[in-house]
Regions:
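FAD-dependent oxidoreductase catalytic-site/capping-region signature
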Residues: 1-156, 164-185
Length: 185
């Protein structure tokens, strides 16, 4: 409960409760494509949010759980109900419409230039973070992740950058702390 409620980035001058439902590992995949061979031209980015039915199903379930919690007498006494597109929403179709009207990114894009094996057709980077087919170019940020992590990207991106620095400098990896033969013995 706060002094100002933020709705789609705008402050509403009254107390309120804001609840976010997050898909930490969405199935929907977007695309980043070159618009031109000119490096100064912005790429074509399509995040393709909520394109996978499983993502929609999880969001609807999250809304239903949140609604059930907020309708409990212990909490309901502190609020007057939902606002905007969420007011009087009950059916799955209404929930999906409200989700599509209010969904936004968590601003943690990742996996758009993912690392993978030579057999992985979706992988842009090899296991040394080098762009396949391009000499002298590596990527060492969240886009190199093969799959989305659950949680904030910051520490993982630092680890990727540290590993990339070691690769560029030609440092050998540290030996395994627990070699497999000792684990299985």
């Amino acid at each position: 409960i706060g002094r100002r409620l933020l709705v789609r980035g705008r402050a509403i001058a009254r107390p309120g409760i804001k609840i976010d439902i997050n898909l930490e590992r969405p199935k929907s995949l977007g695309t980043v494509r070159l618009a031109s061979s000119d490096p100064l031209v912005s790429p074509l980015i399509d995040p393709n949010y909520l394109s996978d039915q499983q993502d929609i199903d999880h969001m609807v379930k999250g809304v239903r759980v949140m609604s059930e919690i907020m309708s409990r007498p212990e909490i309901a006494q502190y609020h007057q109900g939902s606002l905007g597109p969420w007011k009087n929403v009950t059916s799955d179709a209404e929930i999906i419409s409200a989700i599509r009207a209010t969904a936004y990114t968590g601003h943690h894009p990742a996996c758009s230039v993912r690392m993978g094996t030579n057999n992985d057709k979706m992988a842009v980077l090899d296991n040394q973070l080098r762009v396949k087919g391009v000499e002298g170019l590596r990527v060492c940020d969240a886009s190199a992740m093969p799959s989305q992590i659950t949680g904030n990207l910051y520490a993982t991106v630092i680890a990727i950058a540290e590993k990339a620095a070691d690769m560029i400098l030609g440092k050998k990896p540290l030996p395994a702390e627990y070699p497999e033969e000792k684990i299985n013995a």
